[in-house]
Curated annotation (Swiss-Prot):
Pathway info: Protein modification; protein ubiquitination
One Pfam family cited in the UniProt record for this chain: zf-ANAPC11
Source organism: Mus musculus (Mouse)
Annotated protein name in UniProt: Anaphase-promoting complex subunit 11
Domain notes: The RING-type zinc finger domain coordinates an additional third zinc ion.
Length: 84
């Protein structure tokens, strides 16, 4: 018996791999997008700090820009440095 495929429709899903399920700043799911974005994906990436906490890029940038003196992680209060 031989099987011949006449038509194939692929379906895919994606998700960010992070320590948590939600952003610690906006509390939105990482599989969604931050409040500033309309659609999730590459335009709303996740960023990690050296402390290994993860946030939407737009959320942490707003947080850091709002701090006057030294920039700290909103979760553990360590000095914020982006993980490379």
């Amino acid at each position: 018996m031989k099987v011949k495929i006449k038509c194939w429709n692929g379906v895919a899903t994606w998700l960010w791999v992070a320590n948590d399920e939600n952003c610690g700043i906006c509390r939105m799911a990482f599989n969604g997008c931050c409040p500033d974005c309309k659609v999730p994906g590459d335009d709303c990436p996740l960023v990690w700090g050296q402390c290994s906490h993860c946030f939407h890029m737009h959320c942490i940038l707003k947080w850091l820009n709002a701090q006057q003196v030294q920039q700290h992680c909103p979760m553990c209060r360590q000095e914020w440095k982006f993980k490379e």
